Each structure stands twice: as structure tokens, then as C-alpha cells.
Amino acid sequence: MTHFNKGPSYGLSAEVKNKIASKYDQQAEEDLRNWIEEVTGLGIGTNFQLGLKDGIILCELINKLQPGSVKKVNESSLNWPQLENIGNFIKAIQAYGMKPHDIFEANDLFENGNMTQVQTTLVALAGLAKTKGFHTTIDIGVKYAEKQTRRFDEGKLKAGQSVIGLQMGTNKCASQAGMTAYGTRRHLYDPKMQTDKPFDQTTISLQMGTNKGASQAGMLAPGTRRDIYDQKLTLQPVDNSTISLQMGTNKVASQKGMSVYGLGRQVYDPKYCAAPTEPVIHNGSQGTGTNGSEISDSDYQAEYPDEYHGEYPDDYPREYQYGDDQGIDY
């Protein structure tokens, strides 16, 4: 007998193989062994996989359940005839009524690839045989439920077309019935005030929200100047352009009258400087400092209190006396 050479599994393949092997049920194997031996009358042996590997016992099993399912059973020791027996068994149980997802593949049994699936297929086959009336002393497999066909007349079928299940939804709960059109103004009332309910659908409870509170009604355009008043002075605003001091003010400190940025400013202390009594002329310009800043006459008077006499003396008389004997010879 020849065998296929297959090396050990590593990595993910080994992990998957070990996981499949862990699902193998030893008790189910013992029950299947007793059931197959009772139906066929043939011994499987101690090794369940090697006893079913050639496919001979499996072909005899399906022929007992459904006579004539496998016409020819190969008893050769070669690999290909044994694989042919397993393939014939798979076709026979599928024709017997087995579902495709319950059937194992030939390599699962022949190469010991997935004996858990082989075990699942044989248990399902035992349950299908029990459903079809093939009973044994070994209770294995689950009997399938019998199909029950019901027939309804045309009147009941038409009546059922007008009834929909809750899986399709319902129109008996919350809906938008009675809602006003989009954008329509709705009047509000408070149920806590024990007032009567509204007469129409345009009035809703405060629990639904309100559009009567804070708004931008009466607000000025951006950039418009607003007058300010102080609520503590019990002043009343004249119009919507007057706001409280809590909103800020532009009436207090400012930079009005400040000199050009970077220029020096004349400083004096009014405690030590007296106010001027007469006007003062500063270098030909009155009221203007040398640095261009605006200063008063009192500032200049405070800087030079002793040199000021009210006027400047005239050192050069404007009228000259020319006598007869005075002159210039050219």
C-alpha cells in the first residue's frame, strides 16, 4: 500500500489543526462505531480513521440505509480506488437527503485532515436515517421534524395581504400628524399655569421649546454707535441704541489730545508753579513748545519766573539823529 507523504504542520496551520482536533468528541466516536457495526455487521477496529479510510465500510453503510446507492465497491489497497469509494459514498448520502454543508470532503478522512467534520457527517446521517424510519438499538443523531403542509383558501390569503407584521414597522405610535408647516410660527402655553389647552395644533407646550425668549430683535447694524446709560442712576434708555454699562463704555478714558507717538512732553507740578498773569511768547510762536507739543503760557512762566518782566527791552533804538556835521565821506 502506498501513502501520501505529508509533513508536520507549523505556525498558523498547526494552530488551526489543533483547534479542530480539540473539538473531536470521543464519546460520539464510540457511539458511531457501535451504530455502524450494528447496521453493516462489519468491524471497524481500534483506529476509527484507519477503519473507514478505504471507504468499503462506508459504502456498505449507505447500501444498508438505501439499497443500491453504490453499484460497485472497490476492495483494492491502492489509494485511488479507496478515494473513489469515499467519493461514491459522498454522492450517495447527498442523494439520500444530506445537506451539502453537513458533508465532509474526501481528504478530511483519507489524509486525516478533519476527523471532526467526518464525525459530524456520520452523526447527521444517523439522524436522517432515524427520520426516515431506520431504527437501531443505538440512539444517536437527532430526528428531523416532519414537514407539515397547510393549505389556505383564497379568501384567507387575500385577507392576510392587508395585515402587516410589526417587523415592517407601525403607524400607531409617535408621528408628525398635526404638525404645522416648516417655518410656521407656533404659539406657546405653559401647562403648569393651569391654563386651557389650545384650540388648534399651532400651540405647543413649553416642553417643546420656545421662540419668545432672547432674540436679536431691535439690534443695531454692526459698527453702529450705541449710547450708554447706567442702571444704578435710575436712568431710562431712550431707544434700543442705548445699552447698560455692563456692556462696556466708550465715554471714559481715551487718547484724545495725546501728542504724536515718540515726542517728548513738558511736565510740571501745579503745586510749585503759579499761574501766569500775562501772555508769554516762546521763540516767535505763542502757545507751542519747541518739540511741537501744545503747552500753555503758565508752563513757560513756571520755568523762568525771574527773567520775565512783561516785555523785552529794546537795545537798538529805531530813530537816529543825524546832525550837519555828522556824515560819511565817500
Swiss-Prot record:
SMART domains to which the protein is assigned, alphabetical: CH
Enumerate the PROSITE patterns for this protein: CALPONIN_1, CALPONIN_2, CH
> Which Gene3D superfamilies did the record assign?
Calponin-like domain (1.10.418.10)
A biological process from GO: actomyosin structure organization
- Calponin-like repeat residue numbers: 164-189, 204-229, 243-268
- Residues the record lists as N6-methyllysine modifications: K158
Comp. bias regions, Basic and acidic residues: 306-318
Q: Which GO terms describe its molecular function?
A: actin binding; calmodulin binding
Where N6-acetyllysine occurs along the chain? K23
Q: Pfam families annotated for this entry?
A: Calponin, CH
Q: Which GO terms describe its cellular component?
A: actin cytoskeleton; cytosol
Q: Which keywords belong to this entry?
A: Acetylation, Actin-binding, Calmodulin-binding, Methylation, Repeat
What InterPro entries does the entry give? Calponin-like, Calponin/LIMCH1, Calponin_repeat, CH_dom, CH_dom_sf, SM22_calponin
List residues of the Calponin-homology (CH) domain: 26-130
Q: What does this protein do?
A: Thin filament-associated protein that is implicated in the regulation and modulation of smooth muscle contraction. It is capable of binding to actin, calmodulin and tropomyosin. The interaction of calponin with actin inhibits the actomyosin Mg-ATPase activity.
Put simply, this protein is called Calponin-3
